[in-house]
Amino acid sequence: MAGPSNQTQPPPPVLTQPSLSFTQGLLVGQLSVVLLIGAFIKFFIFGEAPPHPSRNGLSNRTSSHRRSYSLNSISADSSPRTLREKPSTSNILRPVPSSSTNTRSILRKTYYSATPTNPTSKHSRSRPHHSSHQPESLDWFNVLIAQTIAQYRQTAYILKDSPTSSILASLSEALNNPEKKPSFIDSIKVTDISLGEEFPIFSNCRVIAVEDPNSDGGRLQALMDVDLSDDNLSLAVETSLLLNYPKPFSAVLPVALAVSVVRFSGTLCISFVPGPGTSDQTMSPSPSPPKEASAENIAVDHQSPERQSARQRAPHQHKYTNTNTAGATAAATADDNDTHAKLPHGIPKTSLAFSFLPDYRLDLSVRSLIGSRSRLQDVPKVAQLVEARVQAWFEERVVEPRVQVVGLPNIWPRMGRTGVRGSQEETEAGAGGSAPADIPGTAGGDGVGVRGGGGGGGVGGSGGGSMRGTSGWGMGYDGLRYRHNAHGDGGVGAGPGQSAGAALYGGAQGGGGGGGRGGEEQFAIPGSMPDPVVVT
């Protein structure tokens, strides 16, 4: 029996060495993760870059890959222009096809349905149609118009003491034009002006398409109802009728008139028409009498020196505050006038044409006072003559088929009329609607009193009229009503519920406040005239 030493033991197993070390495997794993993340970012997050077009590839594009422009598309017969071709000076601006500017295209692109339901009338005259689109409210437009009118009233009140730019001077010069006034009428003196307190209300706006032989595809016209009532828009004048036979100034008959607008309502028509360039009249000239000198034109002529000085200061003033807003406005207006004057002859200029339909309503109140010793008050025949003359004046200017054409200003941004809102305006805007300090009659205890009450030292109105203080501006600002006094002691306000005719005969009742004048004294006609005799 063999011993344990003679037994052979099997050799130990040989351990195989790994081909890669631990460090190398870690690096390979990290690298694979980085590659996977990079591939994910490249193919799933970033898109494929578009191929760079070659220079010769621009002219070889097919029509399916070419972007079509609705307003600037080139006609089919014209060949495309490559970047290497230099455009000539005559075709830099791409033409606009007429199919993109006609009324049908405009209505389609603005999603407005204005298909007329009634056919047009004959004899080549357009007749207003009813639109299938629902009438729109004009509340936002009423606010803008009210702000504009309020600014005009404030400007007229601020310039009331100006010898040339005031509305009183403009009206006096227009009424006393020697070319228009007959020889038997003495100089006309404006005794009372009221610019009103209320604002016109526009409503029921609708856009219609009308036929126009001067426009391709017709033109669009906006119709809106306007109503102005319960206002004190009035004008009072004094003059004398002269009897020049058998010798000049043989007899003199004093006459006092006061015309007030009780109510106005009608349908306003607004449209844009291309002007003939140098002339403002785009329509056929009407056989109306020669154009009379209006108060607005005279006011513009008087303001020409101020506009020239403002235009000289405009290039050096690029910022403004609330104190020089009027100067910036005058500079902008002068800049627009210069731009229109530089336009070559024959270039059409877009204009705004507006008129009223013949079914308007204009109610007037005419008060008259005729005579010296024995005065006749409110003669019906005089009221009829004055009302007929005012109606004829209105119809000759703004009632269809006659229209008023106004050239649109240049709205291109210019540095001469660029301004920055002042810190004072921003502070007032954030103060919750507090009244600004520069508006007369809104600050202080001696300003305009509420209706039924009165400020200190005010003048008594009639009934529910407003009691206006005289310590501040000398008259109430809310009505913008002032009286041209021959003694030069300033104007006196009148209540909003009081007609202009009461200013002629002392119709205001009620006593004034402390320091104010009585109703009979402030509204009496200058001169020694006895009490009026009422005609029955």
Swiss-Prot record:
GO terms for molecular function: lipid binding. Residues 1-25 are lumenal. Keywords: Endoplasmic reticulum, Lipid transport, Lipid-binding, Membrane, Transmembrane, Transmembrane helix, Transport. It is found in: Endoplasmic reticulum membrane. Residues 122-132 have a biased composition (Basic residues). Residues 134-409 form the SMP-LTD domain. Residues 52-135, 275-331, 416-467, 505-536 are annotated as: Disordered. Signal peptide: none annotated. Its main location: endoplasmic reticulum. InterPro entries: Mmm1, MMM1_dom, SMP_LBD. GO terms for biological process: mitochondrial genome maintenance; mitochondrion-endoplasmic reticulum membrane tethering; phospholipid transport; protein insertion into mitochondrial outer membrane. Residues 47-536 are cytoplasmic. It is a single-pass type I membrane protein. Residues 321-331 have a biased composition (Low complexity). Component of the ERMES/MDM complex, which serves as a molecular tether to connect the endoplasmic reticulum (ER) and mitochondria. Components of this complex are involved in the control of mitochondrial shape and protein biogenesis, and function in nonvesicular lipid trafficking between the ER and mitochondria. The MDM12-MMM1 subcomplex functions in the major beta-barrel assembly pathway that is responsible for biogenesis of all outer membrane beta-barrel proteins, and acts in a late step after the SAM complex. Homodimer. Component of the ER-mitochondria encounter structure (ERMES) or MDM complex, composed of MMM1, MDM10, MDM12 and MDM34. A MMM1 homodimer associates with one molecule of MDM12 on each side in a pairwise head-to-tail manner, and the SMP-LTD domains of MMM1 and MDM12 generate a continuous hydrophobic tunnel for phospholipid trafficking. Belongs to the MMM1 family. This is Maintenance of mitochondrial morphology protein 1. It comes from Ajellomyces dermatitidis (strain ER-3 / ATCC MYA-2586). The lineage of its organism: Eukaryota, Fungi, Dikarya, Ascomycota, Pezizomycotina. The gene is MMM1.
